[in-house]
Amino acid sequence: MELEAILEGLDPQQREAVTNIRGPLCIIAGAGTGKTRVITHRIAYAVAAGVTDPSKTLALTFTARAAGEMRARLRTLGVPNATARTFHSAALKQLMYFWPYSFGGSFPKLLTSKGSFLGDAMGRSDTSLVPGVATLREISGEIEWAKSLQTAPSDYVEEALQSGRTLRIPNGRPDKENFAEIAKVYQAYETLKHQERIIDFEDVLLLTVGMLEEDRDVRERVRDQYRFFTVDEYQDVSPLQQRLLNGWLGNRDDICVVGDAAQTIYTFAGATSDFLLNFTHRYPKAEVVRLTRGYRSTPEIIETANRILKAGTSHNDHELTSMNERGEELELRSFSTQQSEVNAVVETIANLGKTHSDIAILARTNNQLDPFEAALKARSIETQLKNSERFFDRVDVRDAMRVIRSASVLPAEGGDWLHDLESVLRPFGNADYVRAFITLGKSMKEAGATSLRTLLRELEDRAEQNNPPTLPGVVLSTLHAAKGLEWDHVFLVGVNEGTLPMGNDVEEERRLFYVGLTRAKRTVHLSYSGAPSEFLSGLLASEAK
């Protein structure tokens, strides 16, 4: 593709970023400013200009969905061979390839879900913690946080106390006591993994780092493979991921980082915006380009989001300007009970007259979404549920996939593979994933798919890209899971004191609220029951209805 064709349709800020293809570059990209477009066009521009070869290019991001979108956009720009992966995916591919050379023997079993394995580890430790769902989720999160900071079990308690960690373990005990119990489970978990020759996703990063640092031959081969680096969502890297990036880079500086400190919402998981904020200290000759023109949201939404950040203590000076025409003012409604809030929101959605898949209900926690889901279903309104749990990691989804896989090797009864799909999924009831699988099957059959095996391959590809099949319904999502997504109409519910902000880090919760607001393109409906969140204080000119 010609250089000028790659630049077509870009605004001046985007052009500056895309054409800056030498040396270290830091792009500060606000919500809805065309970040992915800039990343992919910059890679395509560098390839077209002869600065890099597609096979020498590595683009890193944090979700398989985002990586898949990057690859698709690069293909349309004539760059089909550039590598776009998550940190974990890139590390796993290298680790599996070089394992026989660096470690010897067969590759260990990869633990894709910690739940049941943690339960086994708890049984082998002398912890007094009870392995309930909520407790296992907290322990899993703490282990992942500790390993992202490269903190051993023996150092976990001290690190957790110094970092001001808070827990939601339902046993009424002080966090300090629970930290000590988690340390026991953490040690038992690591011991059990070693005994059974199992590694988890954090180990993938740790082992790849160790391999690069200790094995000179592997290090040189990997560095020869990749020479042109791009890191998306750089505000969310952990110290372990930065160490891995250092191993890939060496002393070279052909790196472009893209991020927005105002959208740092994963410090609880070990992420830190320090690497983004200090990029020019590490690379004094680095260029910095700011993308401040917002193309997603209306001026009303952007102005409100800007005020949210200004009210904080982080002194974020990256203010966005909407490039869209003015629209509707944000709506703020108060309710005496959660149920009255649920009823009103669902009634509004039912009467909105908009495509349901263009509507999202966002909340701080999964539990807040349950009554909304029930109320929508009672009105026969389809829903899509998005949360921090990956769709294809769900036990029920994995069970359904196993059944489909078994059926795919058998000849279709009467030649009708779609009928077979419906038959094998019948025992799973009318769950959302069942309806999504069948809907996908119908659309694939209409497009010419000839076998259940074709559907299975599509589902496996989607699992690898974390791109689950969905139904065209109202999206129900936590604020964290909504990151990187957008809808025309957003209902931000349960904006109550004690829920948002939650925990001790008020500024991170402020950024989370900002992320929620900037998911909306056209309208935002804010609501709360009981005491309003401090974030709503003085937010809107008019009083709550």
Segments from the language model and where they lie:
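P-loop NTPase Walker
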Residues: M1-G104, E220, E303-N306, T518
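Conserved helicase NTPase motor core
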Residues: L3, E8-T19, G23-I27, L58, ...
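ATP-hydrolysis module of ASCE/P-loop NTPase motor domains
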Residues: N20-I21, Y101-E196, G294, L418
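Helicase P-loop NTPase motor core
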Residues: A31-I39, I43, P284-E287, R293-I381, ...
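Short, polar/flexible loop-turn hinges at active-site or ligand-entry regions and domain interfaces
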Residues: V51-S55, T76-A82, Y97-L110, M122-A134, ...
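Conserved beta-strand -> loop -> alpha-helix junction used to position metal-binding or nucleic-acid-contacting
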Residues: N81-Q94, R379-V403
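Conserved two-lobed SF2 helicase motor
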Residues: T83-T86, D203, L207-T208, L471-H480
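Conserved helicase C-terminal RecA-like lobe
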Residues: E373-A375, R394, D399-A544
